[in-house]
């Protein structure tokens, strides 16, 4: 989404760090009151004089929303500006880093991005799924105003592919482990 929709300045600052794995990224769509109907989103983006926005709201089910595996976590957050149209047509996409970087990519100060909690899950425990709170966190528009879903779906389509690949990999590993166990098991075999 950043590569296809962000400004050149955002691309130059964020993509090298994200591509190298030095920083990681998330998608922030779902809110406590809206899952599939993102038109009900309440997260707000208030414009600042310098071209940035203050992002305020809560997002849930954020994969890898908080961790210490990278230097920074860059959140792509769907939010609504004050005069945006109602529903899905009023949603914009914003880049909101956990730690604000300097223009040269070195890290500056923490942004107002907080992890409210980490979900207790049955599976995929190595991936923290978080509730994220944005309290006037500084963010930048990615793509066009009120066209956030178009920009977000670039990333979502890639994520869907990788989730499918992950499922195939896990099922193949489970099958191979079960097959190995069944072949090596002594109990129940006839002499």
Predicted regions and their residues:
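Core alpha/beta catalytic barrel or barrel-like domain that forms the active/cofactor pocket
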Residues: 1, 21-31, 92-93, 185-191
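Glycine- and acidic
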Residues: 1, 26-28, 56-62, 72, ...
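Internal maturation/activation junctions in enzymes
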Residues: 3-48
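Active-site lining segments that contact anionic ligands and/or coordinate catalytic metals
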Residues: 22-24, 40-42, 50, 72-74, ...
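Short Gly/Pro-enriched turn/cap motifs at secondary-structure boundaries
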Residues: 33-36, 66-68, 85, 121-127
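A short core secondary-structure module
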Residues: 52, 56-110
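A glycine-rich, basic-preceded beta-loop-alpha segment at the flavin cofactor/substrate interface
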Residues: 61, 100-116, 121, 128-159, ...
């Amino acid at each position: 989404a950043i590569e296809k929709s962000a400004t050149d300045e955002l691309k130059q600052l964020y993509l090298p760090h994200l591509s190298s794995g030095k920083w990681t990224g998330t998608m922030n769509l779902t809110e406590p009151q809206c899952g599939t109907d993102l038109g009900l989103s309440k997260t707000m983006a208030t414009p600042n004089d310098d071209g940035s926005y203050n992002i305020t709201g809560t997002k849930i089910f954020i994969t890898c929303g908080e961790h210490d595996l990278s230097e920074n976590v860059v959140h792509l957050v769907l939010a609504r500006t004050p005069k945006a149209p109602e529903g899905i047509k009023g949603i914009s996409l914003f880049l909101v880093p956990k730690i604000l970087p300097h223009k040269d990519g070195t890290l500056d100060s923490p942004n107002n991005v907080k992890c409210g909690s980490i979900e207790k899950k049955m599976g995929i425990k190595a991936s923290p799924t978080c509730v994220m709170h944005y309290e006037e966190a500084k963010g930048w528009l990615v793509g066009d105003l009120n066209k956030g879903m178009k920009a977000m779906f670039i990333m979502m389509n890639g994520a869907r592919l990788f989730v499918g690949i992950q499922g195939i990999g896990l099922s193949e590993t489970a099958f191979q482990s079960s097959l190995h166990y069944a072949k090596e098991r002594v109990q129940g075999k006839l002499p």
